[in-house]
Structures are given as C-alpha cells and as structure tokens.
Regions:
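Conserved Switch II/interswitch segment of TRAFAC-class P-loop GTPases
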Residues: 141-148, 154-155, 166-187
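Residue-level signature of catalytic and energy-coupling elements of molecular machines
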Residues: 33, 44, 70, 78, ...
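Glycine-rich phosphate-binding loops of nucleotide-dependent enzymes
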Residues: 107, 150, 163, 269-270
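Phosphate-binding/switch loop-helix module in NTP-utilizing enzymes
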Residues: 113-161
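Phosphate-binding loop that captures ATP/GTP phosphates
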Residues: 66, 71-116, 128
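Extreme N-terminal, non-catalytic leader segments
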Residues: 1-42, 87
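C-terminal lobe/tail of nucleotide-utilizing enzymes
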Residues: 1-21, 188-273
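Walker A/P-loop phosphate-binding motif and the immediately C-terminal alpha-helix
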Residues: 35-73, 188
C-alpha cells in the first residue's frame, strides 16, 4: 500500500485508506436532501414497500417534507401506493419527481414507462445506474427525509445505494419466519460493511387480529424477532399486524389515509439521528 496516492477513483482495492466519501455521487445541484433512510429486507415478500410507505406518511404527519425513492427497479410499487402516475416534468436542470396528494415527492422507474405493466428487463449494472440517476438527476425539492425503498437482498442495487448515496440510517423489515435470523444477519452485516447505522427492526405480518373476538393469531408461528434483535443488539421498532385495510389502501393508492401509530417508535428513531 506504500504506493497509494489517495485517489480511489481508479483503484479496486478495499484497503483501509479508501475514502468512503470518494464513492458518493453528487446530488443534483438544484436539489436539497437533509437525511436519507434506506428500508431494506433480506428477502422478498415481507411487505417492505408497505413499511416504507407507512414511515413516509408518518414522517410527513410530523410536519417534515418527505420524498420516496423507489430503488426496486424490477418490482416497483411505491407509485401505486400513493396513486402517483407521472413525474411533474423535466427541464435542462433535471427531472422533477411525481407528487402525492399531500405533496410527498415520489420517484420510480414506473413513472418513466409508457405502460407501468411493462417489465424492466435490464442487467444489474444498468439497473444500478438508473438508481444512481434518481439521486443525481432528480430535483428533490427541500426534502427533510428521503426514504429509499430498496429491492430485497444484498445484490447490485443495495451495494450501489450504500456506496453512492449518503445513507444516514437503515430500517430492516422482516417477518416471523424460521429464516429471520439469517435474513436479518445478512442485512446487518452488509450495513456494517458499508459503515451505516442500523436504526432497528420492523416486524411485519406479526399477527392477525380476529375480527370477531380480537384474539391475536400468529399466522406465521411464534415470532423470533426479539431473539434476533438481542443477538444483533438492535431495537424492535414495530410489530405490524396483517391488516386487510392497509393492503387495500396500498392497492388503491390511499396510503396517506392509513393510521400510522404502529410505526411511531420507528419514526422517533429516525428523528433522533
């Protein structure tokens, strides 16, 4: 390493002299983003986009200006959750994100497609490049908190986001299943490698409440989230039930009407950073 000149831009080494700042992409000069929160999961099907939407709505209700960057290029669903169908437009300065009914700024590949049902059949590097452009080319206007809805797993796009965008904290979404320990572990270890703090765990689909008697039914079996949280020294920020009303609101683009009290602790953890 004696020949290192401090220029990491043309070096593939992961030595201790590598400056993380050198990998960050510059935000669009016309944009302003104060904090970036990534919402991740080790696997698909845990309701990560629903949790992202709930957190965004809860933060907006705190009086903060909120944006949501949909980084799940091949499986985007954020526009549907908020009933957003198009961007505001573009000019020589960049691309203006779509606006939800309450003024949240939304950016997703679906807002750029002629038909939202069209598949995005791209290879990893192209997908990663698109996510970078959502940071460098989009004019996020005075955003206090930008939530990044990540694709599941620990592949190209999560790596690109963590290296290219200055993420301030990570929320891990999981569900009460046997693989939870391994899945959360992968997400935590990746966060540690990227030197990004994990704010806590949100367990989704934690239980179903019987509409007749009110009893909690553990549909996916007994939760292991407390054991996993203790293993990684992380707080459990929320236990969200299976709620048909939330699912219906998501499908109808009405997430801004949903009660968000269940994620209050997660919102507090984000506000504390």
């Amino acid at each position: 390493m004696s020949s290192c000149n401090g220029d990491c831009s043309h070096c593939s080494s992961s030595c201790s002299k590598r400056d993380k700042e050198s990998l960050l992409e510059k935000l669009n000069p016309k944009a302003s983003v104060k904090k970036v929160i990534a919402v991740v999961s080790g696997k698909g099907g845990v309701g990560k986009s629903t949790v992202t939407s709930l957190l965004a709505v809860a933060m907006a209700r705190e009086g903060r200006r909120v944006g949501v960057l949909d980084a799940d290029i091949t499986g985007p669903s954020i526009p549907m959750a908020f009933g957003v169908n198009a961007c505001q437009g573009a000019d020589e300065d960049g691309l203006y994100p779509g606006l939800s009914r309450t003024g949240m700024q939304i950016m997703s590949i679906n807002l750029l497609l002629d038909d939202p049902a069209d598949p995005v059949v791209w290879r990893g590097p192209v997908i990663a490049g698109a996510v970078k452009q959502f940071w460098t080319d989009v004019i996020w206007e005075d955003v206090d908190y930008l939530f990044v809805d990540m694709p599941p797993g620990t592949g190209d796009v999560p790596l690109t986001v963590f290296q290219s965008i200055p993420v301030d904290g990570i929320i891990i979404v999981t569900s009460p299943q046997d693989l939870v320990s391994m899945i959360v572990g992968k997400a935590v270890k990746m966060a540690q490698m990227m030197q990004i703090p994990v704010l806590g765990i949100v367990e989704n689909y934690s239980y179903l409440r019987c509409p007749d008697c009110g009893k909690k039914i553990e549909v996916f079996g007994k939760s292991k989230v407390d054991e996993v949280a203790q293993q990684w020294n992380l707080p459990v920020l929320a236990r969200l039930p299976i709620d048909p009303a939330v699912a219906e609101a998501f499908d109808q683009g009405q997430m801004e009407t949903v009660d968000t009290q269940a994620v209050d602790a997660a919102t507090d953890a984000i506000l504390a950073i």
